[in-house]
From Swiss-Prot:
Residue sites binding Mg(2+) per the record: D70, E140
UniProt name for this protein: CTP synthase
Spans traversing the lipid bilayer: none
Record Pfam families: CTP_synth_N, GATase
Organism: Deinococcus geothermalis (strain DSM 11300 / CIP 105573 / AG-3a)
Gene expressing this chain: pyrG
Amino acid sequence: MKYIFVTGGVVSSLGKGVASASLGALLRARGYKVTAVKIDPYINIDAGTMRPYEHGEVFVTASGAETDLDIGNYERFLDLDIPPGSNITTGQVYLEVIRKERAGDYLSQTVQVIPHVTDEIKRRIRTAGENAGAEIVLIEVGGTVGDIESLPFLEAIRQFKFDEGDENVLYIHLTLVPYLGTSNEFKTKPTQHSVAELRSVGISPDIVMVRSKEKLPPEITRKIALFTSVRENRVFSSYDVGHVYELPLALEEQGLGKAVEDLLGLERTHPNLGVWQNAVRTLKHPNHEVTIAIAGKYTEMPDAYLSLLESLTHAGIANDARVNIKWVNAEELAEGDLETQLGDADGILVPGGFGIRGIEGKIKAAEYARTHNVPYLGICLGMQIAVIEYARHVAGLTGANSAEFDPYAPHKVIDLMPEQLEVEGLGGTMRLGDWPMELRAGTKIAELYGVPQGGTVRERHRHRYEVNPAYVGQLQDAGLVISGVTPGVQGRGAGLVESIEIPGHPFFVALQAHPEFKSRPMRPSPPFAGFVAAALQSGPSSAASGQTVAAEA
């Protein structure tokens, strides 16, 4: 097994995840079995209880792990499901080391960072690669070189080359080269200091990857090579591109894939990048355009909805369309002019979330979509919102609400799942991961998933609340279609409600699941692809003259 470690320097949020995922895509395109590991040096066990404003979205894997959003980047770029144990945190490592000490596994040794903590880190990395059956393991070390939290992880990856041999371990360091407009020059000093800092802990990078606004000129590349002792043909420019899916092509053009093969002693192979080239071509030169309004509460932090935004991009690729996002603050919708805020949208999407803030605005967004025949897609909370709105205004259940928002509501059409009543603690206790959805024949969602006669599909979940089975009959009598269920769930009659839709509407579909977590650039999520297709046909843009979009330069 080969190991590629990616570290970062100068500043955080340089894009190590996207750069690492792009390299993974190049290796996958060459036929290698690749997996990815993300190391997060925080003491949390996982990302599940973190604030979206601080950390971005929580990405849920098929196994139910609540992970860093970069795991989502790896799944999308590598087009595979990342196995359990691939998001390693300081909290996980120390919890296991302390458990072993209490169990007597260390046989009365003095437990220390070296070797006990570093050995546990190395064990977890190797196990992740073995579980994936990988030939090459990409390991991204979160944070910045020089952070005190990262030191045990840097020591562990330093030991890897000693343990595994030079030909099996590769170090890539991502740094920043800022451009100063006042002097019209790229500044390499931060990169020089960052590499020196990395060397001070015993790691010499084999490749330096540089984040910059533009592709670095040859003289700057030569300067970086000289002062970092890295060969010039192993200094790569990770410059700003129009879309992240262009980055694999930009790095391949510079020869990154070949350099990695050479350094790892692999035979050079030719990558098959046709699908990436086609996707980028559509992204840059779409023939159509559509505007989607997202009614959420984290609208100032797009990373809180990263997978959802990427899913809309994938749906745009499938429909040869540019998807423009209109962010709508759900709190402002509650008292605002809906026509002004939603009238120019071709489709309305209400995403997942927790808490009461902005709920009434989201309900108004669902009502607007229903009454104005605007395509609507509800995700997780967005489905619960649609059910509340329908119960209030169509089924005649005045005061209908969710027990999450109003425990004293006269009609709790959304209620806590019985399995959650005895749950203690917040971390890792929701209904998580892949669950089956049995889709009814003849429904819109069954058609979207390619099983018009009905069938079972699997999607990822992250929730504690569900449609109250006591109200399913009344909602159906009022015309709401329960189009998907998880069968065989105790106390749910026909099953736990997984999806709903409104017949006769151009597109009104909502799911309890999070299908955005399984969407890929070349395999878009069926609900998202169908939603964008409906928005293209039904929205204001479809009526505008000259729908074809001028090609971008």
